[in-house]
Amino acid sequence: MDTEYVRSRFIKHFDGTTGFLYASPGRINLIGEHTDYNGGFVFPGAVDKGMIAEIKPNGTDKVKAYSIDLKDYVEFGLNEEDAPRASWARYIFGVCREMIKRGVDVKGFNTAFAGDVPLGAGMSSSAELESTDRKSTRLNSSHSQQSRMPSSA
């Protein structure tokens, strides 16, 4: 995955400045799919494909997200109850809502992201998006002297 390409799309779709770059690897589960969240055993391994996101606080209570691969833009408020219509944006929404529920003072941010893990191939592309979003939101919160999510979460 090319960080410069992600950065160029971020600059184009947002205010012309840069933010923080975050990466998350794809993974495979060698003993079967969907066992991890159904109480089964897992034997995961990272792969050489993954996701890169550029994220920057925007000083609002809104998340503005651009999926480079899907060429799709979504904006939602952090206090909204209803998830966005775009299925990919629901992962970002869910992570933000859960962090807020756990006491993290999540602030609005702009993000553009892309990945080279095939969608729907059982390589956890949705988990990449969630972990990249959680990691970046948590780090942005700690950079801003805000409360942190417990490490056991």
Walk through the language-model features, giving the residues of each.
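ATP-binding N-lobe of GHMP and related small-molecule kinases
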Residues: 1-127, 131-138
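Single conserved hydrophobic/aromatic residue that forms the stacking wall/gate
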Residues: 135, 139-153
